[in-house]
């Protein structure tokens, strides 16, 4: 959807999202991805943080060569970059590597060193939200790996919705999957997984803001540990 989005475009996408949500309330991930492909053709993108390749594998089966968007913030673990490279070589996909306007060094020079510590919300905005917004402008829909079991903030995540924040249809294809569902798929299909998962990191983001979960906490309790912040701003709607 490389165009200037009109109000008519947005209304049409909203209506499509509403119909899809009503018709596919109990749909499987495969059904959701087929619906996405039937309605948007090649005009959608799959987002991945390279924690694992489950969603990537599912999407590639529906549309070989599908665009897979990866936000290269400049702060990722080496293991995450390695997983991205491995995923790109193993699966029939096209990785769209999205970087912020500024390198980490340039950002440090402009706003001060280690913005992730002094203002994590602004750091996420500059290195994730702004680049994502620009990248999504060329698509009519995006597919995410957001799951309801990730954290209380995601417990009611819809399968299909209109993303008001970014102006396109959003499909959370594996929103209903449990941790057991994920592991079963990985075991049965030999799906690539970020090695940090086996080291005790069930939710992986930028290295400075990712720790192992707190005792008794949800998978995302290791993100921005000690702060009230629980989301980076990508899933505001």
From Swiss-Prot:
Q: Where in the cell is it found?
A: Cytoplasm
Q: Which cofactors are reported in the record for this sequence?
A: [4Fe-4S] cluster
What chemistry does it catalyse, as a reaction equation?
[thioredoxin]-disulfide + sulfite + AMP + 2 H(+) = adenosine 5'-phosphosulfate + [thioredoxin]-dithiol
List of residues binding [4Fe-4S] cluster: 123-124, 206, 209
Q: What class of enzyme is it?
A: oxidoreductase
Question: What does the cofactor field's note say?
Answer: Binds 1 [4Fe-4S] cluster per subunit.
One GO BP on record is:
sulfate assimilation, phosphoadenylyl sulfate reduction by phosphoadenylyl-sulfate reductase (thioredoxin)
Annotated protein name in UniProt? Adenosine 5'-phosphosulfate reductase
């Amino acid at each position: 959807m490389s165009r200037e989005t009109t109000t008519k475009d947005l209304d049409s996408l909203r209506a499509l999202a509403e119909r899809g949500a009503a018709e596919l309330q109990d749909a499987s991930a495969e059904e959701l991805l087929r619906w996405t492909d039937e309605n948007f053709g090649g005009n959608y993108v799959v987002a991945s943080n390279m924690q694992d390749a489950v969603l990537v594998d599912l999407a590639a089966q529906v549309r070989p060569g599908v665009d897979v968007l990866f936000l290269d913030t400049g702060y990722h673990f080496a293991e995450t970059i390695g997983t991205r490279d491995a995923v790109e070589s193993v699966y029939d996909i096209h990785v769209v590597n999205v970087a912020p306007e500024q390198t980490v060094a340039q950002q440090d020079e402009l706003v001060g060193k280690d913005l992730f510590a002094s203002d994590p919300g602004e750091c996420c905005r500059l290195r994730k939200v702004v680049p994502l917004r620009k990248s999504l402008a060329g698509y009519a829909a995006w597919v995410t790996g957001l799951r309801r079991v990730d954290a209380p903030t995601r417990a009611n995540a819809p399968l299909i919705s209109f993303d008001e924040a970014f102006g396109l249809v959003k499909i959370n294809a594996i929103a209903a999957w449990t941790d057991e569902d994920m592991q079963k798929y990985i075991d049965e299909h030999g799906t690539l997984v970020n090695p940090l998962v086996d080291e005790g990191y069930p939710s992986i983001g930028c290295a400075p803001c990712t720790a192992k979960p707190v005792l008794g906490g949800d998978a995302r309790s290791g993100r921005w540990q000690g702060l009230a912040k629980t989301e980076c701003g990508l899933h505001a709607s």
